[in-house]
Every structure is written in structure tokens, then in C-alpha cells.
Amino acid sequence: MQYTNKYDVPIEVIRAVQNDPYTKGDGVVLSVTQLIKPPRIVALQTKHDDEISVDYRDEVFKLLGKGVHTVLENANMGDENIVPEKRLYAEIDGWKISGQTDTMSLREKLLTDYKCTSVYAVTSDKPEWEAQLNMYAWLWRKHGHQIERLRILAILRDWRRSEADKKFDYPQTPVVSIDIPLWGFIRQDEFVRMRVNIHQDAANGGELPDCTDEERWTRGSKNIRCEGNWCQVSKFCSQWQSIKEKKS
């Protein structure tokens, strides 16, 4: 991946992006966050990694999220009941996968994931959050811990007090706790295997499945994810090129 700086992002931010220590782990094929993505996007990102260009401005919110994660993780230091940020690994159908969880309460058997996100995200359906946390719970089970509750702790970066004062259906605080449905063991197992298998098919040269309307963030006639290149691979995507041709 190549970075550009078309908007004169300050050097401190550039260095922070460049010094990101993130890794999905040695020998890991895909992480949980990749597994819940559309296989078309992941396969194209892998194939065209050297050709993908991202501007530093588009990484700023990721830095904000990492900062929030660090502060909240530090708040739990010294609490022996809390397992802090931890990367877990498992093998399934020949692939090594991993997932990095934020906190797990041993006493409550509660798995919490931190999100620094928008008001819109917490007021609309986010099935990918449910999938992500249940895959994390599956990983913990593989390591001998049963999870009984799942929770998102969301920090709303665009929250406005004036909106909260006017609207009853607007989040009343910039911190929102969301309970996530916990699936049964069989459903978790089947889902993880299904996600691994469809990504294996895509990676092994099989026909790439089309992204669904939901995965393209379709709103009316707009395909927001594709049009804004939020997937980073729209110019390499035959599905998106076909959609554009039909519109023209």
C-alpha cells in the first residue's frame, strides 16, 4: 500500500500512521476484521496491495480510535478481573486466523469491544458488529473460556449536546453501551467456518462473489462504498465497473 499527502496532513500525524505497530500475527492468513469483510474486497486488496493508494487524511479517524482504545485499556490496569487487549489464534480448515479483543471480564464472562464511531453507526443496524463479537467469543471458547455476554462500548466522535437536547431518539451521551446478541456454539462454529471457506474460495482463484447491496452501502441509486472508494479497490473491481456501465 502506498500513502499520499494531498491535503498537507501534519508530519506528526504522518509519523503516527507510519509507526502503527498493528500486526495480525505470524502465519495468520486473515484476522476476524478481514473475515467479516466481503471476500471480493479482501481478495482484491491482497492482489492489488502494491497499487492501492491511501491518503493520510483518511487515516486520521483510525488514529483517534487507537487513542481511545489506549486510554480505556489503561483505565483497566491493575484490575485482575479484566483481561486487557489480547490477540487469540485458531486453526480452521487449514487456515490460521486471529482476532484481537479489547477486554474480557473473567468474573462476568463479558467480552467488550471498544468503538470510536459515529452517531449514525449506533442508531442503525450493524450486523458486522454482531458477527465480529461472536467470532471473538468463538476464539475465547477455543482457548477454554466461555463467554456469556457481548457488549460494544461506543465513543461517538460526532456527538452534539444540542442534538441530544432536542431529539428523544438521539443518543443522550457521547458514550453508548450496546448489548450484542450472543449466538449458540453451533451457530458460531458454522459461521466462522463459512466465512473462512468463502474467503478460501476467493483466494484460490475462484469466482469472486458479488458484494451485496448492504456491503456496497447502497442508498437508493447510490453505491456509497464503491463511489467513495471506501473499499480502496473500486477501480480494480469488475462488479463496480459493470454497475457504472449500466448507469451510463
Each predicted region: which residue ranges?
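Generic beta-structure capping elements
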Residues: 114-117, 155
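Generic solvent-exposed, charged/amphipathic alpha-helical segments
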Residues: 69-73, 133-137, 193, 197
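Short, surface-exposed linear patches
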Residues: 57-58, 133-135, 201-202
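Metal-dependent nuclease catalytic cores that hydrolyze phosphodiester bonds in DNA/RNA
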Residues: 1-111, 118-131, 141, 163-169
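Short, well-structured alpha-helical interface segments that form or flank functional binding sites
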Residues: 98, 128-135, 187, 226
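Metal-dependent nuclease catalytic regions and adjoining charged, substrate-binding loops involved
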Residues: 1-8, 93, 138-248
